[in-house]
């Protein structure tokens, strides 16, 4: 769907920007909680930034 495609683009953009801007762990966790919804996006975010949400 268009909504899913848009969400994928948003999450991909955030992944790039969080990395390029060297954001803090707190900022990354906030983006994870408030923006990310797609399972593969969450996994990539967690793997890229070594986020432990367990």
Language-model segments: which ranges?
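Divalent metal-dependent phosphate-bond-processing catalytic cores, especially two-metal-ion Mg2+/Mn2+ enzymes
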Residues: 1-54
């Amino acid at each position: 769907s268009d909504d899913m495609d848009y969400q994928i683009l948003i999450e991909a953009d955030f992944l790039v920007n969080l990395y390029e801007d060297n954001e803090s762990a707190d900022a990354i966790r906030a983006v994870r909680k408030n923006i990310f919804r797609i399972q593969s996006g969450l996994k990539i975010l967690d793997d890229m930034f070594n986020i432990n949400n367990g």
